[in-house]
Amino acid sequence: MSKRTIQLNCDMGESFGVWTMGADEEVMPWIDMANIACGFHASDPHVMSRTIDLALEHEVMIGAHPSYPDLQGFGRRSLAMNEQEVSEIILYQVGALKALCESKNGQLSYVKPHGALYNDMMSDPSIFRAVVDAVSCFNLPLMVLASANNQDYLDIADRFDVPLLFEAFADRTYLANGKLTPRSQPNAVLSSEEAILNQVRQIARYGKVTSSDGFVIPIEADTLCVHGDNPNAVSLIARIRAALDE
């Protein structure tokens, strides 16, 4: 079976003040889509601006990466918020990044929520609806987790005329239900480069992923998430790019 054309996306701009997170300058040339943090889980106006410059330099698509307001927990903790509050934090963060992009004659191309907000969105229809409602104000696509059954998400998004981009993960393990293994559980992240590359090839060539307990799950992904915050990130992402181009 021929491989699917899949773009690489990566979380970027997650430094804050004098604290540095990730290897953005080294990773950016290898990716197609940069999910730029918007200040609520990481980043600040200067980091956001600098990361936009870097993406524009390398002709990488720019996406907003909003989260719950949780700097201390890096946006990985769920917060009890109603639909209006969720929509408001999305509007606030995406609006800020969009303004910075436009100040540089750049274009914001999509939205991908971060961490706990992403997970909650994929498990709670009310949160998903709140996110889609906010994203619809910008006329942008929303990036969501590719799963065996995407129809429920498509139905909600269609009501708001929001296109969906479906993503898979290169280095995260999957449960039998097609969801990501929570980071709180053991083996949530693949540590072997060969295991990561095998998963990438399976997704790209066959539209499938094997769960941690051996179930083969059909998924069709438009984009593949890679991570740039580990010591071997640059060399691994280069190998992933090569695997996609095989």
Swiss-Prot record:
**Annotated GO biological process:** carbohydrate metabolic process
Q: What is its EC number?
A: 3.5.2.9
Query: Does the keyword section mention Transmembrane?
Result: no
Q: Show the Pfam families listed in the entry.
A: LamB_YcsF
Q: Which UniProt keywords apply?
A: ATP-binding, Hydrolase, Nucleotide-binding
What GO molecular functions are on record for this protein?
5-oxoprolinase (ATP-hydrolyzing) activity; ATP binding
Q: Does the keyword Endoplasmic reticulum apply?
A: no
**SUPFAM superfamilies, A to Z:** Glycoside hydrolase/deacetylase
> Its domain of life?
Bacteria
Catalyzed reaction equations: 5-oxo-L-proline + ATP + 2 H2O = L-glutamate + ADP + phosphate + H(+)
Query: Partners and quaternary state?
Result: Forms a complex composed of PxpA, PxpB and PxpC.
Q: What does this protein do?
A: Catalyzes the cleavage of 5-oxoproline to form L-glutamate coupled to the hydrolysis of ATP to ADP and inorganic phosphate.
Annotated family: Belongs to the LamB/PxpA family.
Q: Could you identify this protein by its name?
A: 5-oxoprolinase subunit A
UniProt lists the gene as pxpA
